[in-house]
Amino acid sequence: MTKILLVEDDKSLREIYGVRLLAEGYDIVSAGDGEEALAMAIKERPRLILSDVMMPKISGFDMLDILRSTTETKDVKVIIMTALSSEDQRKRGE
């Protein structure tokens, strides 16, 4: 079963996304902010991280930079979700 780390500071959205992903057969672990997600990524070793951008403590973009520079997490696939639509924001997530 594929493990996904779901990172979303809005508890209601985190629950909605989690229920849907569980229904699709994924193993879900979740975090409410980027700081918690970094610890969970090392501990849980997910195959994919699905993350919001705008979060307290550490943004999704900053979390992505840290994940990419950390040996244990540099190869984990990350999908960033955001309502931001500027070209700069899109490039930041690449």
PLM segments and residue spans:
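Hydrophobic residue at a beta-alpha junction
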Residues: 31-32, 57-58, 67, 84
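The feature encodes the CheY-like receiver
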Residues: 14, 56, 65, 74, ...
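Two-component/phosphorelay signaling modules centered on CheY-like receiver
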Residues: 11-29
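Conserved Asp/Asn-Gly motif in the active-site loop of CheY-like receiver
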Residues: 31-35, 90
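Conserved acidic carboxylate
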Residues: 8
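Active-site beta3 strand of CheY-like receiver
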Residues: 44-50
